């Protein structure tokens, strides 16, 4: 092995784990990855070098690359995202490369154990788990843990190793090779869509602990100053910087803001109950600005069951709610404690048409508690809620009765849906995790594969905005409803949902449009870079310049290990600074590998899909009319033209030019892309 070169932010080495042979070896980070910052960039480089483009997800040749970034473990705020890159089984019409981003403490623990990355290859003949503790690393027998749910599996591994270790495991869904499955870490943090790859390799989990120092270049006082400045820019979740109700301490407020920690709110299940004070602007009260249970379950019952917040290593906000619901536990035989956030905290109710939009009802809360505990324990992935919306549309339209065998249809307790009985979810997710029947098997395959099997046109979904379905097997993730043309183009560029909040963190920050336009002028040269939501104007170069910046920031965050729910900090709660943040607080895109997989140079035609529902309006209001988020097709195509020119990609095909690769130091891909006819004009 080459000499280990430690650098600030890097341990200088990683691990290669061959499950076929059982051999684990150290590999140097440098010089091989000298041009890759970390995270996804490192993962994509491994796949470019080592994995043939047509590799299938469950092939032995497929690999898993676990890679945090140079910020991980350093104490830099919000720096605990680990990128896990592999060939995804849920992407349509063919599996393609993508990354999951898992929070918790895995990133920090891997660095503290002394490693920048883990490359996992091959397949084990028997269930194993990977144990890492500094220089002690080995594959251990997991026979007694295989078959267990994620909660019990994590506890068993903690008992065998250390309660202080970072533990990530798969559940029965992954073991049964369900494509819609996850890796679960730190009890509730998940990496979506990658579970079946672990299952196919018989890798039950990864346990990491260590006590190696993390070296940073900055002087201690300088580091403290930077950290304090970063804290000063913090708002609430998704960088919402104004409160959700009028407050004399603030100039502005917005009813949809996630800064919902208001004076007098009581977290009632804390011991003793926590009563929020008048001023949440103090850096020592950042974690009180946000309460997920209140936001997603409704204020009365959310606060009633709120214990405290929790979250990832080195994050002061703590976006997860820990709740205690004794009523749901007694009725449905689940754990009284639940820890979750965002869609995972509420999507259980989406299955039930009567309560899907009624978050304040106890039945909705019960469905949420039962749904997330059951899904997480079985290791089923929701694909950003797409699984639930698929089931619901099939149910509401009477399609299940048409496509399922009569015996299977009659075995399903449909009346529980009408009764809003959350135990239906326990039945449903069990069927998915164990691939039981036609419904269980195909709901677990992702949307277009399910539709194709049942003879339903994909366009029936992509033309129906209620499904949120976008294309390639994934749903929208903050599209035109949040950022007009910028959101549309962004959602077309990735193989799965983009998992990017650089758009919505700005447009829904809570600031009035006049202030946002001033900030847009500061960072992107024109106030025309942003419109008021629901009052969109035709596309322009300024919007696409902002999109270019957003994508570069997203890629940078995925390489550094930063959380995109909080970064970038272009807005702040500070009136004295005109609410302007600092975009230097924290890229490379992965287009080339995707083109090799598809053997396709015309990415614009055959990859960058947008759904038909973005061109519809329930009241048939024209695009660019105040009050509608309807888009205009010619305007969207023009947006692509502008964007591709800005980033030096060929507008006709949406493929990077030879010069574009040179501009970002990817010269090494040019000979291969030329040979395979994947550089436009060559």
Language-model segment annotations:
Residues 59, 79-87, 158-192, 198-682:
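Extended C-terminal regions of large enzymes
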Residues 1-195, 200-239, 260-262, 266-285, ...:
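Protein-protein interaction/assembly regions in multi-subunit complexes
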């Amino acid at each position: 092995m080459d000499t280990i070169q430690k650098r600030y932010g890097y341990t200088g080495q990683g691990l290669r784990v061959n499950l076929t042979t059982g051999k684990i070896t150290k590999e140097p980070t440098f010089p091989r990855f000298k041009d890759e910052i970390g995270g996804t960039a490192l993962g994509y480089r491994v796949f470019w070098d080592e994995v043939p483009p047509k590799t299938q997800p469950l092939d032995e040749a497929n690999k898993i690359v676990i890679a945090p970034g140079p910020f991980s473990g350093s104490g830099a705020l919000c720096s605990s995202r680990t990128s896990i890159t592999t060939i995804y089984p849920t992407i349509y019409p063919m599996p393609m490369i993508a990354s999951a981003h898992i929070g918790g403490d895995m990133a920090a623990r891997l660095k503290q154990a002394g490693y920048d990355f883990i490359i996992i290859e091959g397949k084990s003949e028997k269930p194993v788990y990977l144990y890492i503790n500094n220089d002690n690393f080995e594959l251990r027998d997991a026979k007694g843990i295989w078959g267990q749910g994620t909660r019990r599996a994590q506890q068993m591994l903690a008992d065998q190793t250390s309660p202080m270790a970072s533990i990530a495991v798969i559940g029965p869904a992954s073991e049964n090779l369900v494509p819609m499955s996850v890796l679960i870490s730190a009890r509730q943090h998940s990496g979506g869509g990658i579970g079946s790859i672990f299952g196919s390799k018989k890798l039950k989990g990864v346990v990491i602990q260590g006590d190696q120092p993390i070296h940073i270049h900055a002087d201690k006082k300088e580091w403290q100053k930077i950290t304090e400045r970063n804290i000063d820019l913090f708002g609430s979740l998704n960088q919402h910087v104004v409160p959700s109700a009028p407050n004399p301490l603030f100039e502005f407020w917005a009813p949809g803001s996630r800064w919902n920690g208001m004076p007098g709110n009581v977290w009632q299940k804390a011991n003793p109950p926590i009563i929020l004070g008048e001023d949440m602007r103090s850096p020592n009260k950042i974690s009180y600005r946000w309460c997920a249970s209140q936001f997603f379950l409704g204020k009365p019952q959310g606060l009633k069951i709120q214990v405290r917040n929790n979250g990832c290593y080195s994050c002061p906000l703590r976006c997860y709610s820990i709740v205690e619901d004794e009523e749901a536990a007694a009725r449905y035989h689940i754990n009284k404690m639940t820890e979750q956030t965002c869609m995972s905290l509420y999507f259980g109710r989406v299955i039930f048409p009567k309560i899907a939009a009624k978050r304040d009802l106890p039945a909705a809360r019960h469905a949420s508690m039962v749904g997330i505990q059951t899904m997480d324990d079985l290791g089923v992935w929701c694909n950003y809620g797409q699984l639930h919306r698929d089931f619901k549309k099939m149910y509401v339209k009477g399609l299940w009765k048409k496509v399922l065998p009569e015996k299977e249809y009659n075995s399903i307790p449909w009346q529980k849906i009408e009764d809003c009985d959350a135990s239906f979810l326990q039945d449903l997710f069990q069927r998915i995790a164990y691939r039981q029947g036609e419904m269980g098997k195909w709901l677990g395959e992702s949307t277009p594969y399910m539709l194709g099997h049942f003879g339903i046109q994909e366009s029936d979904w992509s033309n129906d905005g209620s499904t949120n379905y976008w294309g390639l097997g994934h749903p929208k993730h903050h599209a035109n409803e949040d950022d007009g043309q910028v959101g549309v183009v962004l959602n077309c560029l990735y193989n799965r949902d983009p998992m990017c909040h650089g758009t919505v963190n700005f447009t829904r920050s809570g600031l009035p449009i006049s202030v946002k336009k001033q900030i847009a002028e500061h960072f992107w040269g024109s106030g025309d870079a942003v419109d008021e939501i629901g009052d969109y104007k035709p596309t322009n170069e300024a919007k696409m310049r902002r999109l270019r910046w957003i994508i570069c920031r997203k890629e940078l965050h995925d390489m550094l290990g930063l959380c995109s729910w909080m970064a970038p900090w272009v807005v702040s709660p500070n009136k004295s600074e005109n609410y302007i943040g600092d975009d230097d607080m924290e890229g490379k895109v992965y287009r080339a590998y995707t083109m090799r997989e598809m053997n396709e140079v015309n990415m614009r035609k055959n990859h960058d899909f947008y759904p038909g529902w973005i061109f519809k309006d329930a009241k048939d209001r024209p695009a660019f009319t105040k009050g509608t988020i309807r888009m205009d097709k010619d305007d969207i195509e023009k947006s692509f033209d502008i964007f591709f020119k800005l980033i030096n990609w060929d507008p006709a095909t949406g493929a990077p030019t030879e010069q574009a690769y040179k501009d970002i130091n990817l010269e090494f891909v040019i000979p291969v892309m030329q040979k395979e006819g994947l550089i436009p004009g060559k």
